[in-house]
Amino acid sequence: YRAITDRIALKRAENDNLVNTTDMIFFKMFLEEKPDATISFTDVVQLMGGGTPKTEEESFWNGDVLFFTPKDVSHSPFCISTEKHLTTDGLNNCSSRLYPPFTTFVTCRGTVGNLSMAGVSMAMNQSCYALKGKNDFPPLFIYSFTRYVIATMKKKASGAVFSALVTRDFEMEKVFEPNFGNAILFQKRVEPPFSQILANTNEIQQLSKLQNALLSRLSSR
């Protein structure tokens, strides 16, 4: 049991280091020369919504479709499992689409301004936005770009807690104009660390399941 706990801690620390690496690459490529904020965040990023099907309709729930909510934000940049699941009928009867892997989610109610990236395809509830690059800006760039922009927004709020994020907040947020070629190059550079983070996140999930199984076995002795 101790060995599993240590392995999980090791993988989490490795992920933290890899995220720091991607942050440093982003800083070097886009922020080092202190570019002026001349355009709106929504000139670069498209905001998309989610929705929840009727909770009392049993045929909509407990299927195979992952359903992201703010509760599913974890220590990892990637979300690979969710507390709730929809059926195909449930997905077809709510205002969320099925978002592809590497879609960035940002929480806009409850705990506001948390980020997660879909590790697999999943739907999403109405307490979040799903973000996609306009004009083919690639997904890993969008994640890191949004991470930087949200951190800037939080700094500007100078410690004040966001109560909610609405579309207008993103429309009003001025950002630097990213060079498309650099964004593509950034995507290529950070694909290896993000792939490793995703692999580690999958391993952590498997280890946690094993840990829980061991715990229940120990407690039933």
Question: Where in this protein do the model-derived segments appear?
Answer:
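Short connector loops/turns at beta-strand edges and beta->alpha or beta->beta junctions
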Residues: V73-H75
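A general structural signal for short secondary-structure junctions and capping/turn motifs
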Residues: E33-K34, E57-F60, S95-L98, S121
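A short beta-sheet element
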Residues: T69-P70, E83-I150, K154-A157, V161, ...
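Non-catalytic DNA-recognition/assembly elements of restriction-modification systems
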Residues: R2-T52, N62, F67, K71, ...
